[in-house]
């Protein structure tokens, strides 16, 4: 009987000492404490014919974009970050919603593809101007209409669309 009690105590101690103990991997971070910025200075992305979006650079130096394609049926929504992402060996993360909303995914790819778009004035492929990425200050959030929210600190980024998104942090990045 004493062995069973000692074993149960050791097992409980191991679970409680785990950094993820009690954490719900699907738990959506609370973004209410962040200060909302005016979306207009960040609204620098347009991919012909119908995708609008906001772009920003994080205090950590990687780039992010949150977009809405309204003429699609149903509308498409997406949030992505790319570059040297903290807490993961992947260089891209994205959450996408259209017919359904799936959990975000990490991936590795050619980052130059993230900088390409189709211009509406002369429909051809162009490259995003680096000046179009405005710094999203630590402690702030960008709420993109009909899409979702991205928030940053000095060391982390969270983007949420509905019940799914991603959290980037040197302490460990995750998708939900």
Language model segments and positions:
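Extracellularly exposed regions in secreted/surface proteins, prominently low-complexity, repeat-rich
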Residues: 140-176
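Extracytoplasmic low-complexity, Pro/Thr/Ser/Ala/Gly-rich segments
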Residues: 24-71
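Short, hydrophobic/aromatic-rich segments at coil-to-beta transitions
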Residues: 49-55, 137-141, 155-157
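Residue-level signal for mature regions of secreted extracellular proteins and peptides
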Residues: 57-59, 74-75, 143-144, 152
């Amino acid at each position: 009987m004493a062995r069973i009690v000692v074993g149960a105590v050791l097992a409980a101690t191991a679970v409680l000492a785990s950094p993820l103990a009690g954490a719900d991997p699907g738990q959506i971070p609370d973004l209410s404490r962040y200060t909302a910025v005016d979306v207009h200075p960040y609204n620098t992305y347009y991919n012909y014919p119908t995708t609008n979006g906001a772009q920003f650079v994080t205090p950590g130096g990687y780039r992010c974009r949150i977009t809405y394609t309204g003429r699609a049926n149903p509308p498409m929504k997406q949030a992505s970050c790319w570059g040297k992402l903290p807490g993961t060996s992947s260089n891209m993360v994205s959450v996408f919603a259209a017919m359904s909303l799936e959990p975000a995914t990490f991936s590795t790819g050619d980052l130059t593809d993230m900088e390409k778009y189709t211009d509406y004035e002369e429909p051809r492929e162009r490259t995003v101007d680096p000046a179009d990425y405005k710094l999203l200050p630590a402690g702030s959030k960008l709420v993109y209409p009909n899409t979702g929210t991205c928030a940053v600190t000095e060391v982390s980024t969270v983007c949420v669309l509905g019940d799914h998104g991603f959290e980037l942090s040197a302490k460990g990045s995750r998708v939900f």
